[in-house]
Structure formats: structure tokens, C-alpha cells
Amino acid sequence: MQLRRKLARAMGRAITDFDMIADGDRILCAVSGGKDSYAMHALLVDLARRAPVRFSVIAVNIDQGHPGYPGHLLTDYMAAGGHEFRMISEDTYSIVTEKIPENKTYCSLCSRLRRGILYRIARELGCSKIALGHHRDDAVTTLLLNLIFAGQLKSMPPKLISDDGDNIVIRPLIYCAEAELAAFAAEERFPIIPCDLCGSQENLQRKAVSQLLADLDARHPGTRQNMLAALGNVRPSHLFDTGLWKRLGLEVAREEGSARDEAGVGAPAPDVLPVGNLLRNLA
């Protein structure tokens, strides 16, 4: 129960920080059968019962045609709990296996196909938001992947609008630690569906970065949490994006630890922006 409350508080902070849920929302909760999506569904259902705003949750799973897919585990679990649930059958597995060479990871194409299906189903079900189960560790892993392999300073947005403008995607677990979600899933005995049914291997770059983060956190506890905090504590003038400088009206950076910064005298320095302010400035 203590772990459930801790995760609920972290999720609540994310929802509040990024205005993820509004009164009257109908949330499509994408449930893959993994620990994270089960946890997200359980926490959202709890929140819907006690939140000051009224919203509803419908769980959706996509049976993508993987051989031996045990979809009945999810169906039985949702029925036993009396949860609103839809199982959608779409054979994307044959498309992926046809397009992707043997021994290559299917994950990227599979994910894109699944996302497109979710967008369509959300419209059909009248859902105003789509909730995905990405967590803190996903966010910081993506940050490092982009830094190392793409030369970009970005993670995954906690809230985004789809290219077609019809769907808003939210990530309520973005402040939650993967280890705590795993412990919660074990505590609740969720009937987990394995993610390797297709036989595809995890992306090697992501696997390497995940291991790097695990090693760093073992040697320097709090590494992942500090990286998450950094994503919400941005100093644009200490970055090299000239377009960002122009949009924010920056002319020169301030020294670290300047008297103004230390004393907090006067108005906040324009180059010190919590992430919420940054997003509003760029909107």
C-alpha cells in the first residue's frame, strides 16, 4: 500500500505539472500486458475514483497477431475487476516480419503501427487522451540515446499532440521509477504478458545505454533521478541553440553562482527556466 501511494503521488505530480487530465476527459489507457501499463491502468482507475475532476478510463489492448499471444490473461483480468476494456485484433506481426530483415529488431516499426491503431481507436471510442506507460527510466534512457547517437538534446515529451492534430498523448508515469513499478506489479500479481513473443531482440543501442545508466546509478545512487530533475531545470543560455536564444530574447549568459543567482535579487534571470515556463514560451 505504501508503494502504491508513492507511485500515485509521483503520477499525480506529473499530471498536475503538465495539465494532463481535464474535467470530462475520456482516457484511452494503452495496456500491453507489461508491468508498466498494468500499473498505469491501476493508478489511473484509482485516481478517477477520487480526483476533483471527473474523467473515465478505458483500457485498450492490441492483439497484433503474434503467434501464441495469451490475450486471455488481459481479458480475464479486466473482466474480474469490472474494468471497461477493448481487445483490438490487428495483424501487424506479418507486416513487420515481412518488412524487417531477420535478426533485426522489430520494435520501431511495430511501435509505429501500434501507435497508428491507437489513434484510430481513440477517435472511434470518443477518447480525448491516450495514456502511454513510459516511465522515468525510459525518459532518461531516451535523453542519453539522443545525446550519444543523434546529437540532440531531447527526451520524450510528457504530453504531446499527434501529427494529425486529433490525439493528445500523455505519459502519467514519467516521474515513476521502473524498479518501483516492477515491485508494484509483483505486489499486485498482475498477469504479465512477455514482451518478447515475436522473438525480436531489444535495440542494442538502447540496451547499452540502459546498462550504462544502471552502472552509473549503482556507483552514484540518484543518477537517474538527477537526470530527470535536469530535464525540468533548463538553462537555455548555457545551451547552443541559437533559435532558442532568439525566441527567448537572450543576449548573454550569466556566470554560474553570480550574486544575482545566489541572492535571488530582483526578477528571475531570463536564462533560468523551469521546464513548464520553457514549454509555455515555446508554445
UniProtKB/Swiss-Prot annotation:
Location in or out of the cell: Cytoplasm
More about this protein: The thiolation reaction likely consists of two steps: a first activation step by ATP to form an adenylated intermediate of the target base of tRNA, and a second nucleophilic substitution step of the sulfur (S) atom supplied by the hydrosulfide attached to the Fe-S cluster.
Co-factor note (free text): Binds 1 [4Fe-4S] cluster per subunit. The cluster is chelated by three Cys residues, the fourth Fe has a free coordination site that may bind a sulfur atom transferred from the persulfide of IscS.
Annotated [4Fe-4S] cluster binding sites: C107, C110, C198
Gene3D superfamilies referenced in this protein's UniProt entry, alphabetically: HUPs (3.40.50.620)
Protein name: tRNA-cytidine(32) 2-sulfurtransferase
Single GO term (MF): metal ion binding
PANTHER family per record: AMINOTRAN_5 DOMAIN-CONTAINING PROTEIN, SULFURTRANSFERASE-RELATED
Enzyme category, top tier: transferase
Catalysed conversion reaction: cytidine(32) in tRNA + S-sulfanyl-L-cysteinyl-[cysteine desulfurase] + AH2 + ATP = 2-thiocytidine(32) in tRNA + L-cysteinyl-[cysteine desulfurase] + A + AMP + diphosphate + H(+)
Keyword tRNA-binding assigned: yes
Protein keywords: 4Fe-4S, ATP-binding, Cytoplasm, Iron, Iron-sulfur, Magnesium, Metal-binding, Nucleotide-binding, RNA-binding, Transferase, tRNA processing, tRNA-binding
Similarity annotation: Belongs to the TtcA family.
Pathway, per record: tRNA modification
Name of the gene this protein is made from: ttcA
Keyword rRNA processing found: no
Any one annotated GO CC term: cytoplasm
Motif range (PP-loop motif): 32-37
Known role: Catalyzes the ATP-dependent 2-thiolation of cytidine in position 32 of tRNA, to form 2-thiocytidine (s(2)C32). The sulfur atoms are provided by the cysteine/cysteine desulfurase (IscS) system.
GO BP term, example: tRNA modification
Subunit structure and binding partners: Homodimer.
EC number: 2.8.1.-
